[in-house]
């Protein structure tokens, strides 16, 4: 008889490392029981039909089992399949068990349970196969969804049952109980209740006929709950833009199928050997009702391209890594001369000799030996409607010149049907003219000849008058050297435009001819009812626009005094104020705002075609000087841009610019609770982006932590307190179809109801708000706490939420940075400020990822101290600072900090490393107490940003 050695079965997914009843620990190499037997060594279990990954819904206990079982991956209409496994290289009786495990590596026990024809009370399914057919098909499997409220107890029970089964005991030791408690806590953090996998384990009979010989288990593909937003396939439906600048920052509206706002990103990539990829910039608040994303394009990896470059973009889930089909996106080269000023300046300048031949006007000169006026003329586009400069002239040869540039042939060629009061001359072929003359009687011919002679006399008189005036102007110019003498005669020609639509005044501004500008303006103003001063070229630019673009301050002032209209917009909807701010020219902005016509509120708050007013552009350009000038001139610091209703403070928070946000709040008194069209305050944006520094500053300056946006969350528990938990499960699950705006699936909805109902009710009591059944709005909106995924931000918000356990009145703030002694900070500052390049405070700022503050503090008396205060405000600690100094090679600084009393007090070998705020990711999971700062460290973190701009004492949240 063959001897079979059995290693006792042990479940590796529940109790790794727990000792057996004999006191011997299980080696990790023996976690999967092995059957040692010559005939059984080659036996194995395999999945021949995977379960369908998407489209199957998990159900709650109260709903009963599903009407249809979990289908197979290849199942289709008319051909149903189900999950199927088979034992190979073995013939005989066997038992196959199926249970649920997590979608982690390695898989671990899952809280959900299986139901079906062969299921038991423990949530497993067991079937017996053999000896003829070793295939097991599971055609009636259902998955029971548990709530987070019951998740802990179910996991404990499953783990206890596995240990008792594997050890053969009836009770657990205290050590085992504690290990289970800790493992359940860890398991809850990584378990996704919307994803499960099937674990199939085959048991073969031993010598006693008991099914104890286990083959290595096999794990199925992940199965997604169809009610979860993460279960749907990613798909891009539409984009409003498929090309953008190589420098990035273009706003794109993308429509898609249902996504989760905190588990989605837009990835740009190149499918080549370089492997470049980047991600679109957006916050959870930029995801609209799970079906639209508004993001800004990332910059291309190189700015120097001479032709358009096509890349790909796709939607990607952060957790599972699922991606959508790729779409093409084109980066076009950077526009170096968007206003085309440099292109026009590079044109060949005219010379004196250009006007000897083929002059562009009757007085432009003629070739030697030719009569006056027979030189080739150009068609002049007279757009000025008030002009009346048409004239005729004759020559000895009988020809003449019309103001439109056409030559007259014979006066007798006039059309006999002409009935206009003002005579005109038509051009005909000579054959047609001869025929017309021969058919006209002598009386008509005499009349026409007289009429023609009269026209010629009038033309000669006009030409003579113009010649006399030009001659006198030339003599006067020779006497006075004043070019206006010559310009006055041809003042109506100042409306002439070239191929770009530029008038002489445009060209004078482009080429910086200040004296010519002055002379032209004076001549133009002498024309009654003229509009030449405000004429636009083909780019919709007036001379005033060009003066601002080319930064000619005196010219801009002169044009405004002359009556130039500052309200005219260019092709992008930019006023002169927009242009000055976009070029970061605060001096030009000051010149413009001195004139009442520019400082009018309707102009100073006028948006461009993108909906942005000058104050919004000042924030986007990070220019505090322009911002101050505009606000002092009457600009609305809380002005809402037209696309989404963001105020300048919203934009500063969106840019993660702490310095500018503090400046807006403390210096310019921006509304800290201003709302966008979607009801989001700046605090919503800061929290959703996971920024502890901005969040702390806003709440300390009075931001309303309890403010709700307009996006509904899961509804509150029913007013009927007698409603059972299972009933609420059904109600929440079925009602989720009616408020699909929420990003949570049905399980999350139930979990929120079970776990957070008391907290939500308490929050509403603090705001004197009744539950939704007594409110006009059926569902409550998201608060900043609801939007954040950062534990640090959540801690900051909870400290400033009235009524919360961690909330307390604001006390005195610590004076010392990182609780270090004053002399230690001073010595460290001296060491860094006197350090060489690469080992100074700017290098420290770069390594701490706070390089954006270098410009802010470089001219202050204590830049190092200011930098360290911001580092502390971001959640940094002393240990990380020491590690950073060590990486910079500043051993003296490391030694200085290690000798400090603060380091000696708090340092211990077992101290866990804290992750600083600027290293935190937006998707960080809830951290256990072992990963957070201890109480002594928390007390050293300041709760205010007052050190940044110490003017007034900040107020606590409402």
Curated annotation (Swiss-Prot):
Region GRR: start-end pairs: 352-390
Keyword Aminoacyl-tRNA synthetase appears in the UniProt entry: no
Expression tissues: Expressed in spleen.
Composition bias type Basic and acidic residues, residue spans: 753-766, 904-916
Biological process annotations from GO: rhythmic process; signal transduction
Main location: nucleus
Ubl conjugation listed as a keyword: no
Sequence motif: Nuclear localization signal, positions: 343-347
Transmembrane segments annotated in the record for this chain: none
Compartment(s) of residence: Nucleus; Cytoplasm
Post-translational modification: While translation occurs, the particular unfolded structure after the GRR repeat promotes the generation of p52 making it an acceptable substrate for the proteasome. This process is known as cotranslational processing. The processed form is active and the unprocessed form acts as an inhibitor (I kappa B-like), being able to form cytosolic complexes with NF-kappa B, trapping it in the cytoplasm. Complete folding of the region downstream of the GRR repeat precludes processing. Constitutive processing is tightly suppressed by its C-terminal processing inhibitory domain, named PID, which contains the death domain.
Residue ranges, annotated region (Disordered): 350-374, 411-442, 705-766, 904-958
Biased composition (Gly residues): 357-374
InterPro entries the record matches: Ankyrin_rpt, Ankyrin_rpt-contain_sf, DEATH-like_dom_sf, Death_dom, Ig-like_fold, Ig_E-set, IPT_dom, IPT_NFkappaB
Site (Cleavage (when cotranslationally processed)): 467-468
Function in brief: Appears to have dual functions such as cytoplasmic retention of attached NF-kappa-B proteins and generation of p52 by a cotranslational processing. The proteasome-mediated process ensures the production of both p52 and p100 and preserves their independent function. p52 binds to the kappa-B consensus sequence 5'-GGRNNYYCC-3', located in the enhancer region of genes involved in immune response and acute phase reactions. In concert with RELB, may play a role in the regulation of the circadian clock.
UniProt protein name: Nuclear factor NF-kappa-B p100 subunit
Gene designation: nfkb2
């Amino acid at each position: 008889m063959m001897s079979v050695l059995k290693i006792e079965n042990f479940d590796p997914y529940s109790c790794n490392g727990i000792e057996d009843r004999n006191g011997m620990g299980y080696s990790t190499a023996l976690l999967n029981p092995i059957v040692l037997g010559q005939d059984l060594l080659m036996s194995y279990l395999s999945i021949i039909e995977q379960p369908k990954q998407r489209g199957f819904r998990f159900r709650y206990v109260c709903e009963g089992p599903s009407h249809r079982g979990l289908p197979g991956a290849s199942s289709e209409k008319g051909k149903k399949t189900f999950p199927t496994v088979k034992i190979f290289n073995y013939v005989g009786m066997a038992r196959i068990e199926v249970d649920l495990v997590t979608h982690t590596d390695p898989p671990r026990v899952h809280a959900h349970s299986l139901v079906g024809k062969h299921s038991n009370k423990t949530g497993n399914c067991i079937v017996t196969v053999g000896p003829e057919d070793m295939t097991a098909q599971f055609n009636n499997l259902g998955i029971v969804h548990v709530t987070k409220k019951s998740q802990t107890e179910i996991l404990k029970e499953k783990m206890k049952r596995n240990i008792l089964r594997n050890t053969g005991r009836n009770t657990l030791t205290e050590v085992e109980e504690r290990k289970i408690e800790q493992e359940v806590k860890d398991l809850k953090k990584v378990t996704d209740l919307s994803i499960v996998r099937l674990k199939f384990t085959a048991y073969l009979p031993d010598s006693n006929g008991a099914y104890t010989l286990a083959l290595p288990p096999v794990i199925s593909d992940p199965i997604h709950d169809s009610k979860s937003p993460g279960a749907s396939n990613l798909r891009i439906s539409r984009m409003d833009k498929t090309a953008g600048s190589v420098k990035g920052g273009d706003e794109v509206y993308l429509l898609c199928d249902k996504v989760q706002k905190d588990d989605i990103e837009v990835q740009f990539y190149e499918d080549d050997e370089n492997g470049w990829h980047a991600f679109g910039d957006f916050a959870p608040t930029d995801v609209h009702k799970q079906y639209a994303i508004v993001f800004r394009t990332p910059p291309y990896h190189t700015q120097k391209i001479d032709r358009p470059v096509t890349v790909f973009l796709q939607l990607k889930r952060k957790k599972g890594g699922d991606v959508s089909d790729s779409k093409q996106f084109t980066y076009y080269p950077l526009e170096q001369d968007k206003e085309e000023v440099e292109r026009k300046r590079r044109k060949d300048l005219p010379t004196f000799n250009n006007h000897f031949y083929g002059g562009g006007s009757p007085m432009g000169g003629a070739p030697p030996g030719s009569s006056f006026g027979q030189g080739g003329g150009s068609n002049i586009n007279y757009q000025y409607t008030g002009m009346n400069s048409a004239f005729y002239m004759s020559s000895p040869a009988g020809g003449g010149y019309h103001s439109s540039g056409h030559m007259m042939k014979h006066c007798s060629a006039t059309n006999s049907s002409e009935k206009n009061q003002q005579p005109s001359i038509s051009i005909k072929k000579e054959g047609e003219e001869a025929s017309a003359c021969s058919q006209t009687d002598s009386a008509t011919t005499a009349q026409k000849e007289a009429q023609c002679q009269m026209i010629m006399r009038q033309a000669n008189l006009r030409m003579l008058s113009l010649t006399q005036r030009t001659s006198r102007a030339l003599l006067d110019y020779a006497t006075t050297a004043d070019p206006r003498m010559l310009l006055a005669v041809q003042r109506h020609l100042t409306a002439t435009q070239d191929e770009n639509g530029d008038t002489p005044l445009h060209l004078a501004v482009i080429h910086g001819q200040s004296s010519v500008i002055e002379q032209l303006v004076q001549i133009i103003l002498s024309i009654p009812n003229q509009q030449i001063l405000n004429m636009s070229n083909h780019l919709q630019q007036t001379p005033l626009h060009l003066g601002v673009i080319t930064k000619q301050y005196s010219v801009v002032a002169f044009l405004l005094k002359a009556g130039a209209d500052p309200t005219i917009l260019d092709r992008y909807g930019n006023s002169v104020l927009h242009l000055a701010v976009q070029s970061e020219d605060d001096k030009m902005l000051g010149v413009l705002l001195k004139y009442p016509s520019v400082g009018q509120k309707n102009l100073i708050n006028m948006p461009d075609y993108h909906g942005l007013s000058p104050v919004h552009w000042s924030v986007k350009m990070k220019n505090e000087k322009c911002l101050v000038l505009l606000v002092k001139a009457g600009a609305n610091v809380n002005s809402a841009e037209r696309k989404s209703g963001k105020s300048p403070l919203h934009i500063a928070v969106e840019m993660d610019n702490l310095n500018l946000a503090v400046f807006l709040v403390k210096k310019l008194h921006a509304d800290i609770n201003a709302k966008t069209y979607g009801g989001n305050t700046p605090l919503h944006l800061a929290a959703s982006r996971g920024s502890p520094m901005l969040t702390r500053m806003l709440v300390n300056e009075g931001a309303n932590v309890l403010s709700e946006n307009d996006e509904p969350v899961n509804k509150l528990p029913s007013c009927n307190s007698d409603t059972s938990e299972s009933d609420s499960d059904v109600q929440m699950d079925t009602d989720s179809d009616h408020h699909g705006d929420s990003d949570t699936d049905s399980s999350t909805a139930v979990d929120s109801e079970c776990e957070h109902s008391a907290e939500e009710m308490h929050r509403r009591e603090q705001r004197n708000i009744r539950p939704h059944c007594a409110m006009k709005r059926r569902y409550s909106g998201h608060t900043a706490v609801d939007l954040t995924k950062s534990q640090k931000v959540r801690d900051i918000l909870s400290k400033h939420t009235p009524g919360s356990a961690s909330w307390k009145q604001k006390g005195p703030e610590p004076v010392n940075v990182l609780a270090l002694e004053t002399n230690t900070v001073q010595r460290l500052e001296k060491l860094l400020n006197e350090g060489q390049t690469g080992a100074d405070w700017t290098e420290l700022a770069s390594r701490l990822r706070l390089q954006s503050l270098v410009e802010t503090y470089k001219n202050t008396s204590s830049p190092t101290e200011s930098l360290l205060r911001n580092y502390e405000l971001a959640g940094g600690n002393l240990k990380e600072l020491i590690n950073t100094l060590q990486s910079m090679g500043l051993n003296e600084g490391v030694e200085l900090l290690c000798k400090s009393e603060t380091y000696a007090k708090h340092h211990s070998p077992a101290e866990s490393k804290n992750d600083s705020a600027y290293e935190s990711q937006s998707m960080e999971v809830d951290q256990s107490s072992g990963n957070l700062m201890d109480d002594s460290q928390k007390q050293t973190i300041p709760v205010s940003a007052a050190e940044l701009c110490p003017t007034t004492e900040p107020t606590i949240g409402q």
